[in-house]
C-alpha cells in the first residue's frame, strides 16, 4: 500500500510538472507572438498619441508614448483597461459607469501597483498574465482528469488561439475570472468544497457572471451525494459563496450611494435587462435587416456557435459543465445594448472553457484540427490589430 501511495504521488508530481511545462510553452508563445504583433502594428501604423474622449478614452491616465515602452506597454492601454486603472488609482466614480466593475481586480492592481512604485499598468498586466498561466495549468489538469493528456494539450492551445484570446494577456478580467472559475469547478469535482467555495467567491468578485457558479456547484454537490438529503453536510454551504460575492458588491454600492446596477447599465452603458431570448432575437433581426456592424456579426455567430456547443456539452461531458455553460450564456444574454445588441459577446464567450475541451476532443481528427486552428489564428491576428489600433472588438 505504501509503495502504491508513493508511486501515485510521484506520478501526480510528474503530471503537474508536465502541466506547468506545457502551460509555459503556450504562454510564452502567445505572449511573444502577440506582443511582437502589437509592436509591429504600432510601428507601421502609428496612432495619434493625444487622448480623445470618443476615439481614444484614456480616462485621465497618461498615455505611454515613445520607444519600446509604447510598443510593449502602451499598446495595451485600451478600453476597459483604462477603467480598471482609474478605479485602482482614484476609486469608483459616484456618477460614472465604472461602478459596475466588481472590486477584486482593480483592488489587486492598486495593491501591487503601489508595491512596485506606482506602476499600475505593469501591475495590471502582471496580474492578468500570471492568472492566464495559472488558468492554463488548471485547464490542463481538469481536462486530463476528465479525459486524457492529448486532449488537455489541445484545449490549452485552442483557448489561447481563439480570435479574442488576446484579452487573456491584456489588463482585463478574462484571465483572473477563468482562473477562479476553473479552480472552483476543479476543486468541486475533487470534493474539496471549502476551497471550491473560496474560488467561486473570488470569481464573483471579479466578474458579475461569477454568481451563476452557484448552479453547477450545487448540482455537483448534490450529485456527489446521490441527491439524497440525508447525505448533505455543512460543506454544502460553500456553493452559496458565488451569489454572496454579488450580494456583497450590491450592498457595497448601495452604502456608497451608487445607482443600482440596472440603472447604471442603462444610463452609462446603453444596456437594458431583458429575457435572454430577446437579446438574441434582436441581434438576429438587426443582422437580417442588414444593419449589423462587423463586430455585431461576429458576436452573433459566436453566440450561436457556443449555444450549439452547450448542447453538445450535455452529451459529451459531465453534466456540471453543461450546466455551467447554459447558465453562463443565459446570464450573458440577459442584457441587450441599444447600439450593438450583443456587445462584447465575442470576448465573453472565452469564459465558456468547456467549449474548448469539446473542440479539443473534435481536434483529434487532423482535418478538424486544421479547420479549428487556421481560421482562429487568422481572426486572432486581425482582431488583435483592431484592438491595438483602438478599434472596438468586444
Write out the residue ranges for each language-model feature:
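Transmembrane-helix signature of polytopic, membrane-embedded enzymes
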Residues: 119-123, 139-161, 179, 320-323
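Short acidic/glycine- and proline-prone juxtamembrane loop motifs at membrane-interface regions
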Residues: 169-176, 345
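Short hydrophobic/aromatic helix or loop-helix immediately within or flanking a transmembrane segment
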Residues: 75-118
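Signature aromatic-anchored transmembrane alpha helix within multi-pass, membrane-resident enzymes
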Residues: 239-243, 365-394
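Specific aromatic-rich, kink-prone transmembrane helix
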Residues: 138-141, 158-161, 176-195, 355
Amino acid at each position: 500500500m505504501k509503495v502504491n501511495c508513493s508511486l501515485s504521488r510521484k506520478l501526480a508530481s510528474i503530471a503537474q510538472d508536465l502541466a506547468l511545462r506545457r502551460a509555459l510553452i503556450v504562454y510564452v508563445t502567445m505572449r511573444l507572438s502577440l506582443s511582437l504583433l502589437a509592436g509591429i502594428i504600432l510601428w507601421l501604423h502609428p496612432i495619434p498619441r493625444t487622448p480623445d474622449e470618443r476615439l481614444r478614452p484614456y480616462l485621465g491616465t497618461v498615455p505611454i508614448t515613445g520607444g519600446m515602452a509604447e510598443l510593449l506597454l502602451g499598446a495595451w492601454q485600451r478600453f476597459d483597461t483604462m477603467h480598471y486603472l482609474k478605479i485602482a488609482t482614484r476609486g469608483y466614480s459616484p456618477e460614472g459607469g465604472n461602478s459596475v466593475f466588481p472590486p477584486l481586480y482593480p483592488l489587486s492592481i492598486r495593491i501591487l501597483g503601489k508595491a512596485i512604485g506606482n506602476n499600475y499598468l505593469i501591475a495590471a498586466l502582471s496580474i492578468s498574465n500570471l492568472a492566464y498561466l495559472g488558468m492554463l495549468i488548471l485547464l490542463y489538469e481538469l481536462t486530463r482528469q476528465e479525459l486524457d493528456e492529448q486532449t488537455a494539450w489541445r484545449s490549452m492551445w485552442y483557448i489561447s488561439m481563439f480570435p479574442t484570446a488576446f484579452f487573456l494577456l491584456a489588463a482585463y478580467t478574462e484571465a483572473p475570472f477563468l482562473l477562479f472559475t476553473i479552480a472552483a469547478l476543479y476543486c468541486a469535482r475533487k470534493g474539496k468544497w471549502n476551497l471550491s467555495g473560496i474560488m467561486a467567491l473570488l470569481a464573483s468578485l471579479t466578474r458579475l457572471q461569477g454568481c451563476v457558479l452557484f448552479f453547477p456547484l450545487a448540482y455537483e454537490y448534490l450529485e456527489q451525494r446521490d441527491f439524497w438529503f440525508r447525505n448533505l453536510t455543512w460543506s454544502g454551504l460553500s456553493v452559496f459563496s458565488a451569489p454572496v460575492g454579488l450580494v456583497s458588491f450590491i450592498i457595497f454600492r448601495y452604502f456608497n450611494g451608487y445607482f443600482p446596477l440596472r440603472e447604471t447599465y442603462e444610463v452609462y452603458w446603453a444596456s437594458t435587462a431583458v429575457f435572454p431570448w430577446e437579446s438574441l432575437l434582436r441581434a438576429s433581426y438587426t443582422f437580417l435587416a442588414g444593419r449589423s456592424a462587423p463586430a455585431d456579426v461576429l458576436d452573433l455567430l459566436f453566440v450561436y456557435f457556443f449555444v450549439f456547443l452547450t448542447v453538445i456539452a450535455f452529451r459529451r461531458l459531465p453534466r456540471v459543465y453543461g450546466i455551467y455553460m447554459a447558465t453562463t450564456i443565459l446570464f450573458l444574454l440577459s442584457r441587450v445594448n441599444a447600439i450593438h445588441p450583443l456587445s462584447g459577446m465575442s470576448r465573453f464567450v472565452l469564459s465558456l472553457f468547456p467549449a474548448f475541451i469539446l473542440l479539443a476532443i473534435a481536434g483529434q481528427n487532423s482535418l478538424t484540427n486544421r479547420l479549428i486552428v487556421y481560421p482562429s489564428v487568422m481572426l486572432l491576428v486581425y482582431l488583435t490589430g483592431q484592438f491595438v489600433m483602438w478599434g472596438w472588438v468586444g
